[in-house]
Swiss-Prot record:
Superkingdom assignment: Bacteria
Pfam families: Cupin_6, HTH_18
Domain HTH araC/xylS-type: 207-305
GO BP annotation list: alkane catabolic process
Record protein name field: HTH-type transcriptional regulator AlkR
Length: 306
C-alpha cells in the first residue's frame, strides 16, 4: 500500500453526514470546531468563509471549500455581513438529510450549499492535517473545465444522496474518502514548496519509507533498513528525508509509534506490554519511558484519564 493510502487508513474517516442549506438575501451560519473533515459544495450562488484563524475565502457556484481539520468557521452571503444572530447548523446534522435548511431574508438572490461532515481521528491524522492549509478551495469543480475525477466523484455523491439502499452509510464514507484524497492530490500537485511532508508522500523514493513506517510500525526499523526500502544509501536517504520531512527518519518513526500507542490505549483492551510490542518497542519499560517523555505521564495513567 502506498504512503497516502496508508495515512488515509490511519485517519479512520467515518460517520459521514450531510445536509442542504438553502439561502436567500442576507444570511449566515457557523460551525464550531470539531474532530471532523468539513466540505461545503456550492451548488448555487456564492458564499463567504471566515475561519477562526483569520483565513477568508469567497466561493462561487461549482466550487468546493474543504476544511480538513474541522476548524470553527463562519459562512455568510458576503464579506460585509456582520450578522450576530446566525444559525449553528451542527444541530441540524442527522445522518443523511435531504430536506433543505432554509436561511436568510426574503430576496430573489437564492443559493444552495451541500455541506458534508465526516468524523476523523485527529491524532492519527495529525501529520497530514498539520501539513494542509486550514482551507482548501477547489475552483470550478463541477464545470466542464474542472477535474474529471471530481465531476465524476460529485456525480456519485449526488446519486447516493437520492437513494435509500442498504450499505448507504459505508458507500458515502468511501465516496468522501475518495473526494478528500483527490483534493489532497490536487493540492500537492500545486504546491510551490518542494520540501514539505506533503511532497514526501508523492516522492518516488521517500514515499516508500513513509509507507513502510505507517504499514509496519512494529518492525525494528533502522535508518539503513528504511534506506533499503527506497533503494538509497543510508547517508543520502537520511539527508533527503531530513531536508523534506524536516525531522530525522527515526524521530518520525517514534512519533508515529506513539500516536498509534495513544489510539490503542483509548480504543483497545490490549495490556501495556502488548501495546508496546504492537508499536515496535522490545519492552514495556522502553515503551513507557518514551511515552512519558512525550506526554509527561505513563501509558497506564494516560489510559485511566482517557
Amino acid at each position: 500500500m502506498d504512503a497516502l493510502s496508508k495515512i488515509f487508513d490511519d485517519i479512520h474517516l467515518n460517520k459521514s453526514e450531510y445536509l442542504y442549506v438553502k439561502t436567500q438575501g442576507e444570511w449566515a451560519f457557523h460551525m464550531l470546531a470539531q474532530d471532523a473533515l468539513i466540505a461545503h459544495i456550492i451548488l448555487m450562488g456564492s458564499a463567504h468563509f471566515t475561519l477562526q484563524d483569520g483565513t477568508t475565502q469567497t466561493a462561487y457556484s461549482g466550487d468546493i471549500v474543504l476544511i480538513p481539520s474541522g476548524q470553527a468557521h463562519f459562512v455568510s452571503n458576503d464579506a460585509q455581513n456582520k450578522l450576530i444572530d446566525c444559525s449553528n447548523i451542527q444541530s441540524f446534522f442527522d445522518g443523511h438529510r435531504n430536506d433543505a435548511i432554509e436561511l436568510g431574508t426574503t430576496s430573489s438572490d437564492h443559493g444552495l450549499i451541500f455541506t458534508v461532515r465526516s468524523h476523523i481521528d485527529m491524532h492519527m491524522g495529525s501529520p497530514l492535517l498539520n501539513a494542509l492549509p486550514s482551507l482548501i478551495h477547489i475552483h470550478h469543480a463541477m464545470s466542464s473545465t474542472g477535474p474529471e475525477w471530481l465531476r465524476v466523484g460529485l456525480y456519485f455523491v449526488a446519486l447516493e444522496t437520492q437513494r435509500i439502499q442498504p450499505g448507504r452509510d459505508k458507500i458515502f464514507d468511501h465516496l468522501m474518502s475518495i473526494l478528500f484524497i483527490e483534493c489532497v492530490r490536487d493540492h500537492i500537485a500545486q504546491l510551490d514548496d518542494p520540501k514539505s511532508w506533503l511532497t514526501a508522500l508523492m516522492h518516488p523514493e521517500l514515499s516508500n519509507a513513509l509507507a513502510a513506517i505507517h504499514a509496519y510500525p512494529e518492525k525494528p526499523w533502522t535508518v539503513e533498513s528504511l534506506a533499503d526500502q527506497c533503494c538509497m544509501s543510508r547517508s543520502k536517504f537520511a539527508t533527503l528525508f531530513q531536508s523534506i520531512v524536516h525531522e530525522t527518519p527515526l524521530a518520525y518513526l517514534q512519533q508515529h509509534r506513539l500516536r498509534l500507542a495513544v489510539q490503542l490505549l483509548k480504543t483497545s483492551q490490549l495490556n501495556i506490554q502488548q501495546i508496546a510490542n504492537k508499536v515496535g518497542y522490545s519492552s514495556e519499560t522502553a515503551f513507557s519511558q518514551a511515552f512519558k517523555r512525550q506526554f509527561e505521564q505513563s501509558p497506564k495513567h494516560y489510559r485511566q484519564q482517557s
